[in-house]
Amino acid sequence: MKMKISCKPIAAAAALLLGGCMVGPDYHRPQVNVPATYSELPGWTQAQPADADAPKGAWWTGFNDPLLNELEPQVAVSNQTVAQDYANYQEALAEVKVARSALFPTIGVTGSGTRQRASAGSTSSSFTRSVGSGAQIVNSGSLEGNVSWDLDLWGSVRRTIEENSATAQASEATLANATLSEQIALATAVIDLRTSDANIDLLQATVKAYEHFLEVVSNQDKYGTVAPSDVVTARTQLENARASLIALGVARAQYAHAIAVLVGKNPEELNIPHSAAMPTLPTVPVGVPSTILQRRPDIATAERQMAAENATIGIAVAAYYPTVSLSALDGFTQSPLGGLLHVANYVWSLGGSATETIFDGGERSGEVAAAKANYQAAVANYRGTVLTAFEDVENDLSGLRILAEQADALDTAVRDATHGTEIAFNEYQAGTVDYTTVATAQATQLADQQTALSVQQSRLLDAASLIGDLGGGWSDSQLHDPRNPDKLQAQPAAASAASTPAAQTSSTTSQGAQPAVQ
């Protein structure tokens, strides 16, 4: 009668040993207070956001600046800060792989061979031949395979994988945050550079106007129709304007150098020509406050760090339970060496061991308490990061709203100041006022023009900041699961986002969507 051996019980036992149980708390994201509206945008009602309710893809195209469009994609591939964080992410992925390996047995093979001279008085019969004076030459050898396996009965290894996987995702989110931060820094530097160019154009026009005023005053001085002090005043104004124009070159050079470094180039490698065009103020869809939890990579980093700390509690708790190991050996051993692989020389062994700590002076309880404290610190960091995110967006929105009002007022002020300068100069030529009145009007006009340009710069910077504080089109759905390496892309989403086709942001609001900020 034949015996049938079923593989099902063996498979079930293996599954039990592999699965075991997992001690320690399972992770659940803690609740945070999320406002229904942004206070700086009254009338906003909470709704599920549509795809158009956040910056998308190449958000920088909304500024309509050729330099920005050319350089922004280079940040993700050439910026050295991003490169460093990418390497850190690769290291984190490797740590997940290392942790996963502990789930499986370690298989090895050992081979050895020995040839030795035995003493003449040896009684061993394991020799192949004799040499002079009765000495013996002994040959021996072995070929063995061995297996060792530490069983993860309590989930310590799986909690370690959970911890390392969450850490890897935190590293990926950190990479995304670094990429976004460097892209916003580039946008800021380009805006500063363009503002510097606009200031240069303004002062060049001012110098030209002052040269004309000085020429008129100098001609009148030749005929004695004006006081000599008028010439001095006009010349002083002109030279001050020229000095200010020269000084702008320092700041512009620094902005250009910063731009080069942000795209991974030496400053001398990047020549940025002067441009008279300022970037366009983009439309920035804001969306509901709750969506910021998914859009900000720094929040994702904090959340994943929290998950990693939660897993360490399980690792610490697992230390209370015994460690169970299995081992096996299978192979051949023979002395003398001839016929090593014969069935008669076959050997094997199976074994197991269990180790349990009886007393550790409170070490394990201390480890558990420390893990729980670290988790609570991570929770506080997560909630603090969320609060800071809401603060950042509110600051950006209030800045854009107030600066828009200031820009409207300055437009009127610049028009009036320009007209006032014309009137003052005409009155001076008519002899009804002295040149001090003209100089005062000119100074007021230049100051108002520079202030208006500064406000325009601030609005652009706030718009860039708002885009960054909303996540720049990033989403935590782009995070990869490092436990499934086959699904990992060659480059994480943060680095590949820069090559996304340009996506123009829409100024149309969907039902219940956030009004666009202009």
Task: Identify the meaning behind each predicted range.
Residues A118-S122, P228, S335-G339:
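Outer-membrane beta-barrel proteins
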